[in-house]
């Protein structure tokens, strides 16, 4: 059967592409091998945030006395009920994704796709022809290939982020290999739920892609939960539930009921292996600025192109690819610099634009201003004063170069700054805006007002 568009993958990039294609009357086929909604909805963003919210409530209950509330009796955790709630949330949202695809009048087929040529896709022995192909196949966890890890994984001791969402119970001891975003979120989750957590990080600090103030504060917050962080730890091997590492020439080891390996993700592009696509020196498929491969009617979007593995970045890329197929200019390409990133710890971390570290490395002139949450009335009222808002500006124009926020509502606050950066707004624009009071959000305008006095007199 002939289609205008075949979309391989029904995750964030894929289903949004299908929705946009449907609005423009393209005859569309969506191929999905496992999860409608992709990793994000089924075994990523949504289920982790569901569990992290419950973990945050546990934190509040354990510290109820700090809020003048006495609880008689023990705070008990019902893990099975938490998993059941997680499943209901996922099921509801998967239904929503299926409804979006159906309302776009896109056809669907289940199975693993293989692109045979620029216009033909094979699924479960059947072939489908199309004018354009959008590959939105997502990514998968990267595994350690060091000695003993394959056996430990086979024996159920070594797990990935997908398995960490459906354990039979809260592990008494959890080892997290990798101190990036995913590893840190799981460390917060399980430490709040009662696990004894140890993080093995290969470099000198956790969250190394963020500025040092972020790493330092998050490390302190983890330590209040009795999380042990071992930095400069080069993992060497595993023996079932024991991980061995080298640190400053000395060998050490740590034992856990489960060992969560969180060292990044690999794009799923095997469906394109039969094509002679242009690749770079690292064997990655080369794309142009419009997300086209060297075969122009084949696009790769979302995690599958590994440009920025975030669902909201994938949404925009999915829309943009279809927009480009239609030869329209309604959708702007996704820009890394104005795409916010968040860590759903307690408090949350969010950033957009350059980090101060990147500005220094690239020699970009900047001025910075920051305020701690201890100056914010709402934060004091909420008894949540751990955190800060830091912003960097162009010293000549006042344009926003970057921002980092640690606050209970950081993931909601950062959207304002992503919009401001994308629109080219300046420190003057935000300083002259009126924020509701009392809110944590007014810290953004307060930082800009302080910056005017500090740097733009």
UniProtKB/Swiss-Prot annotation:
Catalytic reaction list = N(6)-[(R)-dihydrolipoyl]-L-lysyl-[protein] + NAD(+) = N(6)-[(R)-lipoyl]-L-lysyl-[protein] + NADH + H(+)
GO BP terms in the entry = 2-oxoglutarate metabolic process
- Free-text remark on how the cofactor is bound: Binds 1 FAD per subunit.
SUPFAM superfamilies assigned to the protein according to its UniProt record, in alphabetical order: FAD/NAD(P)-binding domain, FAD/NAD-linked reductases, dimerisation (C-terminal) domain
- Report the cofactors: FAD
Function of the protein: Lipoamide dehydrogenase is a component of the alpha-ketoacid dehydrogenase complexes.
According to UniProt, the name of this protein is Dihydrolipoyl dehydrogenase
Name of the gene this protein is made from: pdhD
């Amino acid at each position: 059967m002939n289609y205008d568009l075949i979309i391989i993958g029904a995750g964030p990039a894929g289903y949004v592409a299908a929705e946009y294609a449907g609005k423009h009357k393209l005859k569309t086929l969506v191929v999905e091998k496992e999860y409608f909604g992709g990793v994000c909805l089924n075994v990523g963003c949504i289920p982790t945030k569901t569990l992290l919210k419950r973990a945050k409530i546990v934190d509040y209950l354990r510290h109820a006395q700090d809020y003048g509330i006495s609880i008689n009796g023990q705070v008990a955790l019902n893990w099975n009920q938490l998993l059941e709630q997680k499943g209901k949330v996922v099921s509801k949202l998967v239904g929503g994704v299926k409804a979006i695809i159906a309302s776009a009048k896109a056809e669907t087929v289940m199975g693993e796709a293989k692109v045979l040529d620029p216009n033909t896709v094979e699924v479960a022995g059947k072939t489908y022809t199309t004018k354009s192909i959008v590959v939105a196949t997502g990514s998968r966890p990267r595994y350690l290939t060091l000695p003993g890890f394959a056996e430990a994984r086979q024996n159920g001791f070594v797990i990935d982020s997908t398995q960490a969402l459906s354990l039979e119970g809260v592990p008494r001891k959890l080892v997290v290999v990798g101190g990036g975003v995913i590893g840190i979120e799981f460390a917060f989750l399980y430490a709040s739920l009662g696990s004894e957590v140890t993080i093995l990080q290969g470099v000198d600090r956790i969250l190394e892609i963020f500025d040092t103030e972020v790493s330092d504060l998050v490390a302190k917050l983890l330590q209040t939960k009795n999380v042990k962080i071992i930095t400069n730890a080069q993992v060497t091997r595993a023996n079932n539930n024991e991980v061995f590492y080298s640190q400053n020439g000395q060998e050490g080891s740590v034992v856990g009921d489960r060992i969560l390996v969180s060292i990044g993700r690999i794009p799923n592009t095997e469906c394109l292996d039969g094509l002679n696509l242009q690749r770079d020196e690292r064997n990655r498929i080369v794309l142009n600025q419009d997300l086209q491969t060297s075969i122009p009617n084949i696009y790769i979007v979302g995690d599958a192109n590994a440009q920025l593995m975030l669902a909201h970045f994938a949404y925009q890329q999915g829309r943009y690819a279809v927009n480009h197929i239609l030869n329209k200019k309604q959708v702007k390409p996704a820009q890394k610099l104005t795409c916010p990133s968040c860590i759903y710890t307690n408090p949350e971390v969010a950033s957009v634009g350059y980090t101060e570290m990147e500005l220094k490395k690239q020699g970009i002139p900047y001025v910075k201003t920051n305020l701690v949450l201890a100056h914010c009335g709402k934060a004091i009222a909420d008894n949540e004063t751990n955190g800060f808002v830091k912003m960097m500006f162009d010293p000549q124009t006042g344009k926003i170069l970057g921002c980092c926020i640690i606050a209970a509502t950081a993931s909601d606050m950062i959207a304002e700054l992503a919009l401001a950066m994308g629109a080219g707004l300046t420190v003057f624009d935000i300083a002259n805006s009126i924020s509701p009071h009392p809110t944590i959000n007014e810290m953004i305008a307060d930082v800009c007002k302080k910056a005017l006095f500090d740097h733009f007199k």
